[in-house]
Swiss-Prot record:
The keyword Nucleus applies. This is Nuclear cap-binding protein subunit 1. Component of the nuclear cap-binding complex (CBC), a heterodimer composed of Cbp80 and Cbp20 that interacts with m7GpppG-capped RNA. Belongs to the NCBP1 family. Signal peptide: none annotated. GO terms for biological process: 7-methylguanosine mRNA capping; mRNA export from nucleus; negative regulation of viral genome replication; nuclear-transcribed mRNA catabolic process, nonsense-mediated decay; primary miRNA processing; regulatory ncRNA-mediated post-transcriptional gene silencing; RNA splicing; siRNA processing. The lineage of its organism: Eukaryota, Metazoa, Ecdysozoa, Arthropoda, Hexapoda. The keyword Phosphoprotein applies.
Amino acid sequence: MSRRRAHDTEDESYDHRRNKRRRVSENQEIEDRLESLILRVGERSTSSVESNLEGLVSVLEADLGTFRLKILRILSDCAVRMPEKCTVYTTLVGLLNAKNYKFGGEFVDHMVKTFKESLKMCRWDAARYSLRFLADLVNCHVISATSLLQLLDTMIDVSNEDTVPQVRRDWFVFAVLSTLPWVGRDLYEKKESALESLLLRIEVYLNKRSKKHHNALRVWSSDAPHPQEEYLDCLWAQIRKLRQDNWAEKHIPRPYLVFDSILCEALQHNLPAIVPPPHHDNFEYPMPWVVYRMFDYTDCPDGPNLPGAHSIERFLIEEHLHHIIETYHHERKDCAAQLLSFPFKHKIPLEYCIVEVIFAELFHMPTPRYLDICYGSILIELCKLQPATLPQVLAQATEILFMRIDSMNTSCFDRFVNWFSYHLSNFKFTWSWDEWDSCLLLDGEHPRPKFIQEVLQKCLRLSYHQRITEMMPTTYAKLIPLTPVPNYKYANEEAANLPGTAVAHQLVVAIRQKCTPEEVVTILKDIPSSGYSGEEMSDGSFNALKIDVFVQTLLNLGSKSFSHSFAAISKFHSVFRALAETEEAQICILHNIYELWSSHQQMMVVLIDKLLKLQIVDCSAVATWIFSKEMTGEFTKMYLWEILHLTIKKMNKHVIKLNSELSEAKDKLAKADSSSSDSEDDSSHKRKKPITHADKPSEEVVERMEEKLEAANVNQKRLFLIVFQRFIMILSEHLLRSDTDGRDPDTDWYRWTIGRLQQVFLMHHEQVQKYSSTLETLLFTSDLDTHILEVFQQFVALRA
């Protein structure tokens, strides 16, 4: 009997565990089903949003008792992650609140917590979407208009804070302004005087704020035909127009209007007092931007009209399209499909809106959100999905960009070149070049012929020289790149008169016979240190002729491909390091690469990148070489600045990596110390596993890491000082010479150079910002020419 009872007890225990697992599994299934229903509400094409909502409310109401927390979390996540369905979810919450007042209060508290947490963690978009959601709950009779106005007033109070960056004040004003299209009508009807008071405070702030940064962020230096408005100014103009129209907009879907008779009976909740977190030095706020405009209604002759630049519909459409790109940019096909499935596509010229928004992203200053190729690949997919209309709109946009290129920002010029060459390569390099042949009459430094020349150079990287020659009309011959072949001077007819020819020929034979690096060093010993025509590059600390013979001979032998060149450099790495002991020697190496490969820009870029990776040349040497007299003829060509930017990025990545490693080591050290002190105090065996001795870095290791980081910071600062000092020198010299000769200094060369200076500031703004006070003290002083000083002041204003 005792055995049977024991067996029965075991069966009961097993059944209990199995039933518990089944309940957990069933609960998980229900939770997943609820999440799926909430996420997909309003997306069924077979029934209306309103009937979707009614059905979902019935389901959720029945499950509130068991899955309350899960439903709260899903709804608050949807509010932040799916802002395009904001009004659908606010209606859902409103209907639930009408049936269950307690749940409505819990949701408001949960949403307020999400909003405050987003502000605290500097998740600015999430905070703005949370605020919008709270505001739209006023329309659904969940939140009182009075308490929302108190919150908006509190946010505008930030605009009066002293000693905080303007970008902080700007964001809080922007967050309030961008919320008003959703709730403005309701506030106007219920609290008109309070709304007007709020708008007056915003206007006072906007009138007094600095816009020093504006010119640095413009795509074009001219406002014709479309003004380039600063984002807050543009949104304020749109809100003012909306106010003139009595807050009636035509874009936002408002499903709650159908349920007004139900919602107006519900009790409302008051928002608690919400105080924005105070500013901290480690807070990073969104930078200002300029609203990009390419089209107006005259560019869209057929179909629906494009909303005006100051209509709130333009803002809402653009924001929605930007959000689609943000959500789907990882998958170009999905992104293109979603853009073309825009919910209001029959009310607007959708293709024009999409193209304008994509170029707005591509030309966004200081840097685009995503890689250039991301936007190019999305445009290609759009052309495939909409072949009847989108290619024509894109061609029209390209024509507009080309005609306005004279005043285009230098950074945007580069992006335009990169995009257009990539686009051509995907469409058989077909273009109506004859329509642009008027540019052939212009000076070579003018942006139009320069654009075509740079596009062809980029196309060469994506194709081959004969293909480029065949695709272009004969009239464009002077803009077609040279055949990319090495110019090995020791094989030329005049080589017999060159001092290193004999050794060069000896070196060719030795390398072909697979000699060792040591044997190369022995051969090079025979080269005398004098009698070299390029000796003026040397200060006597290195043998310029030895570098000349070795670099040109080795790279010529490896000229068959990038791989051959890389293999040659790697094999004779020790020889390079021995020859490149000083910065002057490194500059000499770079000069010889240019001399050999002057007709192959891409080869120069990849070779110099390789030399930097192998630490054969320093970043500072590359910067000095770029600004040397030998490179004057190349100074306005894109590839040279591509080299400079990859050099700066390499230095920046090195500093960031060391910083990250040091922070990680310090954290481990602190945790190890904390763990050891806990082990002394804590007698419990149920504590976390402490960091082992092997994981714990010693204090000496941390000190060495600090020294390495300090040295890297010194090198980084030196690199920026070299670059900016050289810019100041050549620009000051040009301005002084123009003034002395009585000439207009505003030449094509000057605009390219000042544009490149601005580009360095903006492309590397996060790293340059650290040294802004040093730059102001040493280089950008008050006695500097205002044209140069303004570039620095505009850069500083971005984070001011």
